[in-house]
Amino acid sequence: MAHLTHPATRYHLIVAASAEDLARQTAEQVAAGIDLALAERDRAQIALAGGETPRAAYRHLGGEHLPWERVDVLLGDERWVPADDPSSNARMLRETLLAQTPASRARFHPVPTDRPTPEASAEAYAAELAALCPGPLPRFDVVLLGLGDDGHTASLFPGTAAPGVSDRSVTIGAGKGLPRITLTAPVLSAARRVIFLVSGAGKNQALARLLDPAEPAMRTPARLVRPAGEVVILADAAAAADLPDA
Protein backbone atom coordinates (compact mmCIF):
# COMPACT_ATOMS: atom_id res chain seq x y z
CA MET A 1 0.00 0.00 0.00
CA ALA A 2 1.49 3.34 -1.03
CA HIS A 3 1.72 6.00 1.65
CA LEU A 4 0.01 8.89 -0.10
CA THR A 5 1.19 11.89 1.85
CA HIS A 6 1.48 15.41 0.54
CA PRO A 7 4.26 17.72 1.78
CA ALA A 8 2.17 20.73 0.75
CA THR A 9 -0.67 19.90 3.15
CA ARG A 10 -1.96 23.13 4.65
CA TYR A 11 -3.23 23.51 8.20
CA HIS A 12 -6.13 25.85 8.89
CA LEU A 13 -6.38 26.64 12.61
CA ILE A 14 -9.78 27.77 13.88
CA VAL A 15 -9.94 28.86 17.53
CA ALA A 16 -13.39 28.50 19.07
CA ALA A 17 -14.79 31.09 21.45
CA SER A 18 -16.07 28.55 23.99
CA ALA A 19 -16.49 24.84 24.61
CA GLU A 20 -19.99 25.04 23.17
CA ASP A 21 -18.70 26.84 20.08
CA LEU A 22 -15.97 24.21 19.64
CA ALA A 23 -18.54 21.40 19.75
CA ARG A 24 -20.88 23.21 17.38
CA GLN A 25 -18.18 24.05 14.83
CA THR A 26 -16.86 20.49 14.90
CA ALA A 27 -20.34 19.12 14.22
CA GLU A 28 -20.82 21.61 11.38
CA GLN A 29 -17.50 20.67 9.76
CA VAL A 30 -18.32 16.95 9.84
CA ALA A 31 -21.86 17.57 8.59
CA ALA A 32 -20.54 19.68 5.71
CA GLY A 33 -18.26 16.84 4.66
CA ILE A 34 -21.16 14.39 4.74
CA ASP A 35 -23.33 16.76 2.72
CA LEU A 36 -20.63 17.14 0.08
CA ALA A 37 -20.10 13.40 -0.19
CA LEU A 38 -23.80 12.63 -0.52
CA ALA A 39 -24.16 15.22 -3.25
CA GLU A 40 -21.68 13.16 -5.30
CA ARG A 41 -22.26 9.55 -4.20
CA ASP A 42 -25.00 7.31 -2.83
CA ARG A 43 -23.30 6.81 0.54
CA ALA A 44 -20.82 8.61 2.76
CA GLN A 45 -18.20 6.97 4.97
CA ILE A 46 -16.86 8.77 8.02
CA ALA A 47 -14.27 7.73 10.62
CA LEU A 48 -14.63 9.34 14.01
CA ALA A 49 -12.39 9.89 17.03
CA GLY A 50 -12.93 8.29 20.40
CA GLY A 51 -12.13 9.56 23.86
CA GLU A 52 -13.84 12.22 25.92
CA THR A 53 -13.12 15.37 23.89
CA PRO A 54 -15.63 14.81 21.05
CA ARG A 55 -18.64 13.82 23.20
CA ALA A 56 -20.31 17.24 23.04
CA ALA A 57 -19.61 17.54 19.32
CA TYR A 58 -21.28 14.19 18.69
CA ARG A 59 -24.40 15.27 20.52
CA HIS A 60 -24.58 18.30 18.22
CA LEU A 61 -23.82 16.21 15.15
CA GLY A 62 -26.47 13.64 16.02
CA GLY A 63 -29.15 16.30 15.71
CA GLU A 64 -28.07 17.44 12.26
CA HIS A 65 -30.83 16.81 9.73
CA LEU A 66 -28.88 14.70 7.26
CA PRO A 67 -29.92 11.54 5.39
CA TRP A 68 -28.19 9.45 8.04
CA GLU A 69 -29.50 6.21 6.55
CA ARG A 70 -26.92 6.82 3.78
CA VAL A 71 -23.99 7.28 6.18
CA ASP A 72 -21.53 4.61 7.32
CA VAL A 73 -19.95 5.46 10.67
CA LEU A 74 -16.62 3.91 11.63
CA LEU A 75 -13.93 4.55 14.22
CA GLY A 76 -10.39 5.73 13.61
CA ASP A 77 -9.23 3.51 16.45
CA GLU A 78 -10.55 1.36 19.25
CA ARG A 79 -9.27 -0.15 22.46
CA TRP A 80 -9.30 -3.95 22.44
CA VAL A 81 -11.98 -4.20 25.11
CA PRO A 82 -15.54 -5.59 25.16
CA ALA A 83 -18.13 -3.43 23.41
CA ASP A 84 -19.79 -2.55 26.73
CA ASP A 85 -16.54 -1.60 28.50
CA PRO A 86 -16.56 2.00 29.80
CA SER A 87 -13.38 2.71 27.79
CA SER A 88 -14.87 1.45 24.51
CA ASN A 89 -15.04 4.09 21.79
CA ALA A 90 -17.94 2.21 20.23
CA ARG A 91 -19.86 2.47 23.48
CA MET A 92 -19.16 6.21 23.62
CA LEU A 93 -20.51 6.68 20.08
CA ARG A 94 -23.62 4.66 20.89
CA GLU A 95 -24.23 6.86 23.94
CA THR A 96 -23.73 10.14 22.09
CA LEU A 97 -24.00 10.41 18.30
CA LEU A 98 -26.01 7.25 17.71
CA ALA A 99 -28.37 7.94 20.60
CA GLN A 100 -29.64 11.05 18.83
CA THR A 101 -32.42 11.35 16.31
CA PRO A 102 -31.93 11.30 13.34
CA ALA A 103 -28.31 10.00 13.54
CA SER A 104 -29.54 6.71 15.00
CA ARG A 105 -30.42 5.77 11.40
CA ALA A 106 -26.73 5.67 10.41
CA ARG A 107 -25.06 2.33 9.76
CA PHE A 108 -22.43 1.78 12.45
CA HIS A 109 -19.42 -0.47 11.83
CA PRO A 110 -17.65 -0.96 15.19
CA VAL A 111 -14.28 -2.63 15.44
CA PRO A 112 -15.00 -6.33 16.14
CA THR A 113 -13.24 -6.60 19.50
CA ASP A 114 -14.87 -9.95 20.23
CA ARG A 115 -12.18 -11.80 18.26
CA PRO A 116 -9.70 -13.97 20.21
CA THR A 117 -6.71 -11.65 19.64
CA PRO A 118 -6.13 -7.99 18.73
CA GLU A 119 -4.55 -9.19 15.49
CA ALA A 120 -7.70 -11.10 14.57
CA SER A 121 -9.80 -8.03 15.34
CA ALA A 122 -7.56 -5.89 13.13
CA GLU A 123 -7.81 -8.38 10.27
CA ALA A 124 -11.60 -8.52 10.56
CA TYR A 125 -11.87 -4.73 10.61
CA ALA A 126 -9.59 -4.45 7.58
CA ALA A 127 -11.76 -6.93 5.69
CA GLU A 128 -14.90 -4.98 6.52
CA LEU A 129 -13.23 -1.76 5.45
CA ALA A 130 -12.14 -3.29 2.14
CA ALA A 131 -15.70 -4.41 1.43
CA LEU A 132 -17.10 -1.02 2.34
CA CYS A 133 -14.49 1.09 0.51
CA PRO A 134 -13.21 -1.03 -2.39
CA GLY A 135 -10.03 0.01 -4.13
CA PRO A 136 -6.30 0.00 -3.48
CA LEU A 137 -6.68 2.40 -0.54
CA PRO A 138 -9.86 2.90 1.51
CA ARG A 139 -10.95 6.51 1.27
CA PHE A 140 -13.18 8.15 3.85
CA ASP A 141 -15.22 11.25 3.14
CA VAL A 142 -14.51 12.67 6.59
CA VAL A 143 -11.98 11.71 9.24
CA LEU A 144 -12.23 13.37 12.65
CA LEU A 145 -9.11 12.97 14.77
CA GLY A 146 -7.97 13.89 18.23
CA LEU A 147 -4.48 14.88 19.33
CA GLY A 148 -2.74 13.47 22.39
CA ASP A 149 -0.40 15.48 24.56
CA ASP A 150 2.38 13.19 23.27
CA GLY A 151 1.53 13.97 19.64
CA HIS A 152 -0.35 10.76 18.88
CA THR A 153 -3.52 10.59 16.83
CA ALA A 154 -5.83 7.60 16.46
CA SER A 155 -3.61 4.93 18.08
CA LEU A 156 -0.45 6.01 16.28
CA PHE A 157 1.67 6.52 19.39
CA PRO A 158 5.26 7.79 19.25
CA GLY A 159 7.85 5.15 20.01
CA THR A 160 5.66 2.30 18.76
CA ALA A 161 5.54 0.42 15.47
CA ALA A 162 2.07 1.58 14.40
CA PRO A 163 3.04 5.01 12.98
CA GLY A 164 5.44 3.38 10.51
CA VAL A 165 2.97 0.83 9.14
CA SER A 166 2.19 1.62 5.50
CA ASP A 167 1.40 -1.76 3.91
CA ARG A 168 -2.11 -2.25 5.31
CA SER A 169 -5.18 -0.25 6.23
CA VAL A 170 -5.50 -1.41 9.85
CA THR A 171 -2.83 -2.32 12.37
CA ILE A 172 -2.27 -2.96 16.06
CA GLY A 173 -1.47 -0.01 18.27
CA ALA A 174 -0.26 0.09 21.85
CA GLY A 175 -0.80 2.95 24.23
CA LYS A 176 -1.65 3.64 27.86
CA GLY A 177 -1.60 -0.02 28.81
CA LEU A 178 -4.14 -1.38 26.33
CA PRO A 179 -3.84 -3.07 22.94
CA ARG A 180 -5.59 -1.05 20.27
CA ILE A 181 -6.78 -1.41 16.69
CA THR A 182 -6.12 1.63 14.51
CA LEU A 183 -6.38 2.91 10.98
CA THR A 184 -2.94 3.52 9.51
CA ALA A 185 -1.44 6.81 8.39
CA PRO A 186 -1.96 6.11 4.66
CA VAL A 187 -5.69 5.57 5.17
CA LEU A 188 -6.06 8.67 7.33
CA SER A 189 -4.12 10.68 4.74
CA ALA A 190 -6.37 9.47 1.91
CA ALA A 191 -9.48 11.05 3.41
CA ARG A 192 -11.28 13.76 1.46
CA ARG A 193 -11.67 15.90 4.59
CA VAL A 194 -9.46 15.71 7.70
CA ILE A 195 -10.41 17.52 10.90
CA PHE A 196 -8.47 17.63 14.17
CA LEU A 197 -10.31 18.46 17.39
CA VAL A 198 -7.95 19.75 20.09
CA SER A 199 -8.98 20.92 23.54
CA GLY A 200 -7.21 21.91 26.74
CA ALA A 201 -3.97 23.53 27.85
CA GLY A 202 -2.34 20.10 28.07
CA LYS A 203 -2.49 19.85 24.27
CA ASN A 204 -0.83 23.21 23.61
CA GLN A 205 2.70 21.92 23.04
CA ALA A 206 1.50 18.98 20.95
CA LEU A 207 -0.48 21.36 18.75
CA ALA A 208 2.58 23.59 18.35
CA ARG A 209 4.60 20.56 17.23
CA LEU A 210 1.87 19.49 14.80
CA LEU A 211 2.03 22.91 13.16
CA ASP A 212 5.85 23.03 13.08
CA PRO A 213 7.12 22.01 9.61
CA ALA A 214 10.47 21.04 11.12
CA GLU A 215 8.95 18.61 13.63
CA PRO A 216 9.86 14.95 12.94
CA ALA A 217 6.71 13.01 12.15
CA MET A 218 7.77 9.93 14.08
CA ARG A 219 8.10 12.05 17.23
CA THR A 220 4.68 13.63 16.61
CA PRO A 221 2.80 10.98 14.62
CA ALA A 222 -0.15 13.29 13.99
CA ARG A 223 2.11 14.90 11.38
CA LEU A 224 1.94 11.67 9.37
CA VAL A 225 -1.64 12.55 8.42
CA ARG A 226 -0.93 14.54 5.25
CA PRO A 227 -3.91 14.66 2.89
CA ALA A 228 -3.92 16.41 -0.46
CA GLY A 229 -6.27 19.11 0.78
CA GLU A 230 -6.43 21.39 3.76
CA VAL A 231 -6.43 20.02 7.30
CA VAL A 232 -8.84 21.88 9.55
CA ILE A 233 -7.80 22.13 13.19
CA LEU A 234 -10.54 23.15 15.59
CA ALA A 235 -9.10 24.17 18.95
CA ASP A 236 -10.13 25.96 22.09
CA ALA A 237 -8.27 29.00 23.41
CA ALA A 238 -6.27 26.97 25.92
CA ALA A 239 -4.92 24.56 23.31
CA ALA A 240 -4.16 27.38 20.86
CA ALA A 241 -2.57 29.82 23.32
CA ASP A 242 0.41 31.68 21.84
CA LEU A 243 0.20 29.84 18.52
CA PRO A 244 0.42 31.67 15.20
CA ASP A 245 -2.43 31.23 12.77
CA ALA A 246 -1.78 28.26 10.50
Annotated model-derived regions:
Residues 188-246:
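C-terminal functional extensions of proteins
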Residues 2-10, 69-144:
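Ligand-binding beta-strand-loop-alpha-helix segment within the catalytic cores
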Residues 35-64:
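Glycine-rich N-terminal segment of FAD-binding domains in flavoprotein oxidoreductases
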Residues 142-186:
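Class I SAM-dependent methyltransferase SAM-binding "motif I" and its flanking Rossmann-like core
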Residues 1-46:
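N-terminal glycine-/serine-/threonine-rich phosphate-binding loop
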